[in-house]
């Protein structure tokens, strides 16, 4: 079986690593890897290869990084590379580009007789049809979901609309962040895709049920917390935005990143002047008044600084009761 793999982040690299490991005994080969182009990273903005590219090159696999698969010379070149690789199947995981029908038609396909042919499968980090789209893990946490999972699906032209081949669920723990949950689901997805390839003849395509929700891409502007929200919702946002884009707020003119926080009981706020006020700053954390309840901040970071515990932050920033966390738009109008 000849495989083309398309993916970019660590979530995808876990799947590629599992496929390569299992392929040694199963007779699979990965003939080509598609991944996003190198991106500037770090303070020096040096170009950094994706985790998938790094893994593929370490195994001597050909890598191609087109900027588009839909149009122009980049797409034409990519299509030619795909045809030359002569794959039986494409495996896709968090690639970052939409695969048009012309690409989905290139692999020979597994399971003769399937219509449409089983030419490409996707490892999607949610229990479809909930959270189709680019950021299913973060959106599940943000929404307060208590469970999620991985779906192995047959790809088609629509965005995560294809028939489901396998699905397994996991609990979202109360202290899970998008980072920790990504690691959990990456391991699950890696195991599942290997099982799917080993048991192709036993796969059954099941149409997705109604009730789809969509996980739009995360945006840095979302990171700013609205302290008028209820504390439990803000806690979910802090967890969902860790490690990107990191929940943030303004305090005494400085941008503060909030890496960890917990909702605690507190009164509903009817006076807008109290929203965002620091109620306490002690060894337990920085306690901030919200629209409903209070948010206890336990790990913070000042712009240009490092992540520190609340105790270290209080000592270094001199935060005290009566100080106020604000949204940048509020600061601009004050």
Residue ranges and their predicted role:
Residues 1-245, 302-304, 309, 319-334:
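One-carbon transfer enzymes
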Residues 235-334:
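C-terminal active-site/capping subdomain that shapes the small-molecule cofactor and substrate pocket
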């Amino acid at each position: 079986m000849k495989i083309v793999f398309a993916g970019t982040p660590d979530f995808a690299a876990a799947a590629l690593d599992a496929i390569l490991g299992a392929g040694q005994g199963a007779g699979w080969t990965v003939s080509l890897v598609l991944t996003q182009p190198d991106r500037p990273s770090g303070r020096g903005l040096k170009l950094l290869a994706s985790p998938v590219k790094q893994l593929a090159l370490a195994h001597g696999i050909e890598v191609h990084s087109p900027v588009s698969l839909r149009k122009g010379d980049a797409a034409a070149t990519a299509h030619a590379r795909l045809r030359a690789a002569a794959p039986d199947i494409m495996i896709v995981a968090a690639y970052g580009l939409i695969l048009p029908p012309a690409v989905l038609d290139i692999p020979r396909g597994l399971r003769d007789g399937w219509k449409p042919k089983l030419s490409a499968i996707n490892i999607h980090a949610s229990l479809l049809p909930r959270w189709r789209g680019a950021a299913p893990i973060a959106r599940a946490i943000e929404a307060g979901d208590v469970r999620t999972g991985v779906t192995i699906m047959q790809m088609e032209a629509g965005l995560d609309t294809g028939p489901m081949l396998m699905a397994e669920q996991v609990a979202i723990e109360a202290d899970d962040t998008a980072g920790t949950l990504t690691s959990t689901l990456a391991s699950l997805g890696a195991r599942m895709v290997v099982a799917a390839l080993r048991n192709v003849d036993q796969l059954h395509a099941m149409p997705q049920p109604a009730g789809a929700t969509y996980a739009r891409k995360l945006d840095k502007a979302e990171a700013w917390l609205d302290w008028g929200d209820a504390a439990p919702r803000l806690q979910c946002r802090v967890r969902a935005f860790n490690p990107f884009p990191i929940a943030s707020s303004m305090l005494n003119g400085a941008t503060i990143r909030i890496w960890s926080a917990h909702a605690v009981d507190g009164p509903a706020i009817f006076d807008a002047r109290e929203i965002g006020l620091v109620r306490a700053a002690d060894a337990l954390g920085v306690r901030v008044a919200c629209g409903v309840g209070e948010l206890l901040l336990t790990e913070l970071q000042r712009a240009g600084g490092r992540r520190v515990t609340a105790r270290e932050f209080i000592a270094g920033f001199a935060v005290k009761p009566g100080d106020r966390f604000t949204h940048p738009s509020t600061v601009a109008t004050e």
